[in-house]
């Protein structure tokens, strides 16, 4: 969607939230939470418009903050302009350097090469293998095998900063000069938890929320957290957040009814499918001996529709 207007993905990926509540039983407030004011029981969330909303139970699912093209503006009216600006950058560039060889950087490179095979794309990654050490070497090697035919890989190296305006190349930390007229940051996400910074003993040093196995924060039993922001040793993915949500909902109901919280989170196995354009990709399922897939199967699972129909249904929108 950010690379080109092919397939008009914005028509499917930008999902309205007017049907988010089942049977319409809920109120949607479109605003940003700037802080949380805690009282002995419950408290208030403070909005950027100055309004305060009281809560008896608070669930925080604010997700991640990103850099680069996926750092979307907060105001809906600015998103379309942002998308157009990013597309122009990719269209005009001839030599693209992606800083980061995780799933975002890999999928971005595949999309670029699908649309513009003639463009030069280089991924610079700080580790000796693509992705990270959560995944076994056999999967990381398979990823390199899949992407190397179309994309240059510079491993165990880093891009020290942004491209100087008018520059035609960038020099890596190890002194390698790479021709570039566009550098795209793709080095991962950070938890979007600034709104909780005023509360004591809620955040870990890494900015994630310290939780119990019931998803309650360690400091406050009436504040729950889930998704990318929790301090749990697992890869941050939308699929995991969906699994968290069902458990949190059950525990919140138990909490307000004064019942024991029975849903206890013990983590999950790692699963990832990474597209390499529309017709290729790689995947890993962390069950049994660790299953690695590639090619047509990875494409079938994700590349054709990016799982957007399922996401739309889950948020109350039509396919």
Curated annotation (Swiss-Prot):
One short Pfam name that applies is Pyr_redox_2
- At which residues is there a site annotated 4-hydroxy-2-nonenal adduction? 125
Sites where the protein binds FAD: 6, 18, 25, 228, 265
- GO terms for CC? cytoplasm
The catalytic activity of this protein is classed by the Enzyme Commission as: 1.6.5.-
The listed locations are: Membrane
Which membrane topology describes this protein? Single-pass membrane protein
Q: Extract one GO molecular function annotation from the record.
A: electron-transferring-flavoprotein dehydrogenase activity
- Record-listed 6-hydroxy-FAD binding positions: 228
Top enzyme category: oxidoreductase
Q: Which key words are in the record? A: FAD, Flavoprotein, Membrane, NAD, NADP, Oxidoreductase, Transmembrane, Transmembrane helix
Q: Which residues cross the membrane?
A: 281-301
Q: Spell out the PANTHER family in the cross-references.
A: APOPTOSIS-INDUCING FACTOR 1, FERROPTOSIS SUPPRESSOR PROTEIN 1
- Name the chain's protein: FAD-dependent oxidoreductase FVFD30
Organism, as annotated: Flammulina velutipes
């Amino acid at each position: 969607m950010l690379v080109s207007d092919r397939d008009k993905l914005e028509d499917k990926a930008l999902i309205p939230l007017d049907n988010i509540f089942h049977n319409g039983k809920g109120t949607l407030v479109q605003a940003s939470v700037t802080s949380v004011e805690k009282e002995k029981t419950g408290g208030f969330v403070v909005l950027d418009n100055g309004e305060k909303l009281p809560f008896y139970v608070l669930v925080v699912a604010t997700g991640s903050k990103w850099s680069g093209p996926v750092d979307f503006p907060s105001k809906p009216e600015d998103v379309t302009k942002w998308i157009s600006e990013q597309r122009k950058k990719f269209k005009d560039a001839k030599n693209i350097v992606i800083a980061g060889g995780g799933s975002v950087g890999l999928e971005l490179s595949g999309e670029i090469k699908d649309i513009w095979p003639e463009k030069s794309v280089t991924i610079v990654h700080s580790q000796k293998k693509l992705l990270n050490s959560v995944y076994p070497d056999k999967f990381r090697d398979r990823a390199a095998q899949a992407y190397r035919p179309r994309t240059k890989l510079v491993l165990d190296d880093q891009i020290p900063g942004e491209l100087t305006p008018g520059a035609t190349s960038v020099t890596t930390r190890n002194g390698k000069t790479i021709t570039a007229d566009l550098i795209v940051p793709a080095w991962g996400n950070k938890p979007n938890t600034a709104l909780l910074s005023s509360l004591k003993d809620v955040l870990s040093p890494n900015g994630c929320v310290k939780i119990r196995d019931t998803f309650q924060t360690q400091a406050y039993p009436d504040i729950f957290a889930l998704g990318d922001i929790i301090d749990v040793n697992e890869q941050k993915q939308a699929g995991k957040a969906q699994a968290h949500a069902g458990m949190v909902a059950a525990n919140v109901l138990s909490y307000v009814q004064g019942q024991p919280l029975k849903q206890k989170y013990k983590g999950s196995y790692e699963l990832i499918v990474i597209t390499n354009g529309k017709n290729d990709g790689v995947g890993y399922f962390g069950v049994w001996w660790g299953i690695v897939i590639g090619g047509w199967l990875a494409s079938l699972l994700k590349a054709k529709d990016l799982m957007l129909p399922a996401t739309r249904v889950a948020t109350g929108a039509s396919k």
